[in-house]
Design a protein with these regions (language model features):
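Intrinsically disordered or highly flexible coil/loop and linker segments, enriched in small
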Residues: 49-50, 374, 378, 414
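Bacterial Sec-dependent N-terminal signal peptides
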Residues: 1-23
Length: 480
């Protein structure tokens, strides 16, 4: 039976305390690698769906808005991100996630026989943890982390960390043995030990990471082309990396629990004009999946910090993010086929490591949109109508085709704000991102947010931390 750690739900507020079951993996007692793996998976999903992560990212990226001070009123809408939030997320990546994955790897290496597949599974999750951390903070501890002989790990450059992520994924791919039944299976909540799926995922995460790096380091295009030609990456919903929540108390999505804390009515997250308007312009069938109509049946978005509209009887006219997305058993989607397919479409449209091919890009683009709509429950007939009505990329200039691909990426990621924040920054050079955002009124910065500041706790505790945290408007290495 899979162990769902109740502590995963503690991240609903900015005052959450994580259980750190081992401070030093080199001195901790032996624990089943599968249990440690599952413990990390549960806490990771809880972090991603909890208030310390979901709220700052959804509000500051402006893929959602708060309806003004009488409704959500989130400080994060104006770029005030609590040090409790940054600290708790940092603790997950290092104390909970990274620390326990390293212990699981150590124990799998020392098992008899060595559990090579378990090591690979843990390395893939570790790679994704470090990818997420560096995409928030840039330079982070990596090469000297989780080493009991190093008290104060140095901060590695983002370029070094992302290359390290690629190395971890390559190591995992080399370790996977499809003929060996020994793997984390019972405790693998994602794929039940199916190493074919883990191999597919590792290739896809490698591709995604290269797509993040290639604008800053064009030499990565060759590796992108190699992966595209070889195939074997995430191609259907069956390959998705997804954490399944349930309707059972204690195993519900923390986003649902957040709404329960305010009486069970979703009035904290509203439709952003930056999201709803492009969807309406394209007659997107996901609109009723993403949003609730106003009391009069009309869908209306809001600007950042704009006050929600009501009628004379105080019924909401502005659209909130749908109850469907905040349901008890809403799954946490970490990586998926639509994200992969739209990235592949982009690669062909740009000619990254392959000949530019708008026809191939269009094929992948339409397939990605189909998968995105299907994931959110759009009826197949409505998907057909929508997709067949979209202009073909082959009729467009390369610039316009890329704009449409990036807009579909933006729309797809509305409820995945971390991925949204990454995608928006990589969608164009500063001032040319898709969509064009404006700095929120009353924001703590005169420029758009491009990163998080470091956890104050880490700044104080680690003498090798930067003396002063970079500001939220300062670009990361990958961000042009």
């Amino acid at each position: 039976i899979l162990t769902y750690a109740l502590s995963a739900l503690a991240c609903l507020t900015s005052c959450s305390d994580w259980l750190d079951i081992n401070h030093d993996p080199n001195t901790a007692e032996k624990v089943d690698p599968g249990y440690l793996f599952n413990y990390v998976a549960v806490n990771w999903a809880g972090t991603r769906t909890g208030g310390d992560f979901y709220i700052p990212l959804s509000m500051s990226s402006q893929c959602q808005v708060d309806g003004g001070l009488d409704y959500g009123g989130w400080d994060e809408s104006v770029y005030t991100i609590s040090p409790y939030s940054t600290g708790n997320v940092w603790k997950h990546y290092y104390s909970v996630g990274g620390n326990n994955l390293m212990l699981a790897i150590k124990n799998a290496e020392e098992s008899e026989p060595v559990n090579h597949n378990a090591i690979a599974q843990c390395k893939i999750l570790l790679a994704e943890h470090m990818y997420e951390a560096t995409m928030l903070w840039g330079d982070i501890p990596f090469t000297e982390s989780w080493n009991g002989t190093i008290k104060y790990p140095k901060f590695d450059s983002q370029e070094s960390v992302l290359n390290g992520v690629l190395s971890l994924l390559d190591e995992a791919l080399q370790l996977i043995d499809l003929n060996d039944a020994n793997a984390i299976d019972e405790y693998d909540i994602y794929y039940k030990g199916d190493m074919n799926k883990w191999m597919t995922l590792a290739k896809s995460l490698k591709f995604r990471t290269l797509m993040v790096m290639v604008d800053k380091d064009p030499s990565k295009a060759a590796a992108i082309g190699t992966l595209l030609q070889a195939g074997g990456m995430v191609a259907s919903a069956a390959d998705n990396l997804v954490f399944p929540y349930s309707t059972d108390p204690g195993n519900q999505n923390p986003k649902y629990e957040l709404i329960e804390l305010v009486g069970g009515t979703q009035i904290l997250f509203f439709a952003s004009n930056y999201m709803l308007k492009p969807m309406q312009e394209r007659d997107d069938p996901r609109i009723p999946c993403y949003f609730e109509p106003g009391a009069d049946g009309v869908y209306r978005g809001l600007g950042n910090r704009e006050a929600a509209k009501t009628d004379d009887e105080e019924n909401l006219l502005s659209s909130v993010v749908s109850n469907y997305l905040f349901r008890r058993d809403a799954p946490e989607l970490i990586y998926c086929c639509q994200e992969q397919l739209l990235l592949e479409a982009e690669a062909y449209a740009r000619g990254l490591g392959v000949a530019q091919n708008l026809s191939k890009a269009n094929e992948l683009y339409l397939k990605g949109i189909r998968e995105a709509c299907a994931f959110y429950g759009v009826a197949e007939s409505d998907i057909d109508t929508y997709v067949t009505g979209l202009p073909e990329l082959t009729t467009m200039t390369q610039e316009k085709a890329l704009y449409e691909i990036h807009m579909q990426q933006w729309i797809d990621l509305m409820d995945r704000p971390f991925e949204e924040f990454v995608q928006w920054r990589r969608s164009g050079t500063a001032g040319n991102e898709v969509p064009t955002l404006q700095v929120p009124e009353d924001a703590t910065s005169k420029e758009l947010i491009r990163r998080w500041e470091y956890s104050p706790e880490e700044m104080t505790a680690n003498i090798n931390a930067p003396k002063e945290s970079p500001k939220i408007w300062e670009k990361l290495w990958f961000d042009l």
